[in-house]
Amino acid sequence: MTMEVDILELSDRSAKFVLSNVSTAFANGIRRAMVADVPTLAIEYVNLYDNTSVLYDEQLALRLSLIPLATDIETYLPQAECDVCGGEGCPACEVSLTLSAEGPGTVYSRDLISSDPKIQPADPNVPIVELKKGQKLVLEAIAHMGYGRDSVKWQAGVACGYKNMPVITIENCDACGHCAAECPKGIISVEEAGAKIAEEDIMKCSICRLCEQVCDINAIKVDFYENSFVFTMESDGSYTAKDLVLNAANVIKGKAEEMLAILDQL
């Protein structure tokens, strides 16, 4: 059977879609790739030339490393995989960002000046530190490509999960209303003819089966499709939601091609 994708919601940072005719292992592979295997840019080193703020150098470096950066996966390579410099650092695998600020005022992520105009903080209003009168902050930050499996700062997918597509059947209901009262999602309504669930609300079901447990006549049954999954994901801004899913799929494709190449040599 051919894999099917039905997009339910899509914005720059989040998406919700139904992935059908795939195994649980494949669905989990997509989720894991979005979280751990799609490389992103994040600040790795910070050279502090002047810091008279209330924060220690190490605290500033940590805050800077956790600021998501818009990533161009076509231009930059993870440093360990860079053929240009052999992992020493070069324009093909790293980006320089500078910052110079003097108080009074709050320093924000938008104050970082990138050597590559395409690489900017995904959120311009992330506060870094508040400077009082006379305090200064001058630094250079070096951003590298990396993987979420190595550090959370390189994790592009911040909220990626899936569940099996629910299947709910209602037969011979006596309209007692117990199932509707027990449903934590509030998706069951009761009419004179019996309990009812709107088609668009079925995906909200968490498959807790509380409605089954309170039904004395076993009129309602909750199950799920084993090969259909409802995905919900959010990006940290390194990529758009669409690009993150596509890059995750390409990661899985690349691994499969590598395995086939190895098997062909046997």
Swiss-Prot record:
Binds 1 [3Fe-4S] cluster. Belongs to the archaeal Rpo3/eukaryotic RPB3 RNA polymerase subunit family. Its cofactor is [3Fe-4S] cluster. One of its GO terms (molecular function) is metal ion binding. It is an enzyme of class 2 (transferase). It is found in: Cytoplasm. It holds the Pfam family RNA_pol_L. Coiled coil: none annotated. This is DNA-directed RNA polymerase subunit Rpo3. Part of the RNA polymerase complex. Keywords: 3Fe-4S, Cytoplasm, DNA-directed RNA polymerase, Iron, Iron-sulfur, Metal-binding, Nucleotidyltransferase, Transcription, Transferase. InterPro entries: 4Fe4S_Fe-S-bd, 4Fe4S_Fe_S_CS, DNA-dir_RNA_pol_30-40kDasu_CS, DNA-dir_RNA_pol_insert, DNA-dir_RNA_pol_RpoA/D/Rpb3, RBP11-like, RNAP_Rpo3/Rpb3/RPAC1, RNApol_insert_sf. GO terms for biological process: DNA-templated transcription. [3Fe-4S] cluster binds at residues 205, 208, 211. GO terms for cellular component: cytoplasm; DNA-directed RNA polymerase complex. It comes from Methanosarcina acetivorans (strain ATCC 35395 / DSM 2834 / JCM 12185 / C2A). The keyword Lyase does not apply.
